[in-house]
A protein has these predicted regions:
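Hydrophobic/aromatic residues positioned on beta-strands within the core alpha/beta folds
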Residues: 80-81
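Conserved phosphotransfer microenvironments
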Residues: 52-70
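CheY-like receiver
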Residues: 109, 118-134
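Conserved acidic carboxylate
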Residues: 9
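Acidic, metal-coordinating helix/loop segments flanking the phosphotransfer/catalytic sites
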Residues: 19, 32-49
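A Lys-centered signature of the CheY-like receiver
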Residues: 100
Length: 134
């Protein structure tokens, strides 16, 4: 059964590229959101993973979006951002952060890891994924 992934990214070309990679890896896209309102409108318990940028069309709302997606919908959240330092020690309930740019092989490793974690499996995280311990 494919994993359903929500992409929260305000730069259209980056969002479309990530969505293409998601499809190429055999997963389903729950759509693209570019701000808090659209992300929460698309959110549901049917979504497994969210890839969330920090700085969006409505400002630096990514951390609040990620926290809400994790707490309210049980979605595994990975931040994909050019500036992971903005996340400090991490965001409650979320898994971690991946620094842009991200290529196909790295995104595949991260998604494989997140899917394994969601299933309760214990595997080592990819080297580029900075995990939050919260």
């Amino acid at each position: 059964m494919p994993t359903t992934i929500l992409i929260v990214e305000d730069e259209f070309l980056i969002a479309v590229e990530i969505e293409a990679v998601v499809h190429d890896l055999g997963h389903e896209s729950a759509g693209i959101a570019d701000d808090m309102e659209s992300a929460l409108a698309k959110a549901s318990e049917a979504i497994d993973v969210a890839l969330v940028d920090v700085n969006l069309a409505d400002g630096a709302t990514g951390p609040r979006i990620g926290e809400k997606l994790a707490a309210d919908f049980g979605i595994e959240v990975i931040f994909v951002t050019t500036n992971p330092a903005q996340l400090g020690e991490g965001v409650s309930g979320t898994l971690g952060a991946l620094e842009k740019p991200v290529d196909l092989s790295i995104l595949k490793q991260v998604l494989d890891y997140v899917i394994a974690v969601r299933k309760g499996e214990k595997i080592d995280p990819p080297a580029r994924l900075r995990l939050f311990f919260n």
